[in-house]
């Protein structure tokens, strides 16, 4: 869905994208299954073990940190700041803790992590 940016900050989309959006809007989907199937499709394209679509870079950072710290535990998803989880350090090379609209460190903390700059 790339195109020229406008003063409004949006991109024009192709007919194929519009058709896909229309199809999505006119049909019902079980969201959990859609997420699983979409992740599998993207993982195959990327030759990766798995994939997950997120809404933004911030969401991706927070969710990735939560997944690593929680080691797949659903408990951690609902209790990201629990004292039961002691290994929270996320090592970032100096200069990578940048502010892209929000500091990387803030999103690491959202996922329950603690930044350690190396």
Task: Report residues per predicted region.
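General beta-strand structural signal in soluble alpha/beta enzymes
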Residues: 1, 31-35, 52-55, 92-93, ...
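N-terminal glycine-rich, Lys/His-bearing helix-loop that initiates the first secondary-structure elements
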Residues: 1-12, 16
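Glycine/charged-rich beta-loop-alpha catalytic/anionic-binding loops adjacent to active sites
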Residues: 2, 41-47, 87, 115
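Short, contiguous strand/loop micro-motifs
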Residues: 4, 25-27, 91-93
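Short active-site-adjacent helix-start/loop capping segments
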Residues: 8, 30, 60-64, 70-73, ...
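Conserved N-terminal alpha-helix of the aminotransferase class I/II PLP-enzyme fold
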Residues: 15-60, 67
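PLP-dependent aminotransferase-like
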Residues: 70-118
């Amino acid at each position: 869905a790339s195109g020229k940016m406008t003063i409004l900050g949006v991109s024009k989309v192709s007919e194929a994208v519009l058709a896909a959006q229309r199809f999505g809007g006119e049909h019902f989907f079980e969201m959990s299954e859609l997420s699983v199937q979409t992740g599998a499709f993207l993982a195959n394209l990327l030759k990766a073990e798995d994939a997950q679509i997120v809404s933004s870079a911030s969401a991706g950072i927070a969710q990735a940190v939560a997944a690593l710290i929680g080691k797949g535990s659903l408990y951690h998803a609902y209790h990201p700041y629990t004292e039961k989880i002691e290994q929270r350090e996320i090592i970032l090379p100096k200069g990578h803790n940048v502010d892209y609209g929000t500091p990387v460190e803030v999103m690491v903390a959202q996922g329950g992590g603690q930044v350690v700059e190396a």
